Amino acid sequence: MSSIYDNKQFFDEYAKMSRSKQGLAGAGEWYQFKALFPDLDGKNVLDVGCGYGWHCKYAVECGASKVLGIDLSEKMIHEARQKNSDPKIAYRVCGLEDYDYPAESYDCVISNLVLHYIADIDSIFKKIYVTLKPNGVFLLNIEHPVFTAGVNQDWIYD
């Protein structure tokens, strides 16, 4: 399986976005999403669809003991390793559907702006549930269609 983010033209345009250049401070949703984070001190964290690894780095800054960031895109993982490297963070090129979610392994699973790409969302939710430790937290944020809708799109009337 390949990722649209491995397409050079698409990736080059993505790299121009404020979130790519400025990290979390350049992401419009960050300040609301940040408020949902639990205490990560000493916790194991999984970031599914980690992109540039900004949330992985934030988790370490908040005291996480171990963080794994997975993303289907080789280009994204390359950037994550370049921009957000830390001994407590491991990055892996892997699709969400293909990851072997070990049972009760993570205190927190992060998914920011990625699950809208997944066809079988129920399967991913079940896998995430299994991989969370008791009382674990799943932080989920998806893209609203208004954000990606073109300004010249026509309405469909029924």
Residue locations for each model-derived region?
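Conserved SAM-binding loop
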Residues: 3, 69, 140
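Class I SAM-dependent methyltransferase SAM/SAH-binding core
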Residues: 46-48, 52-99
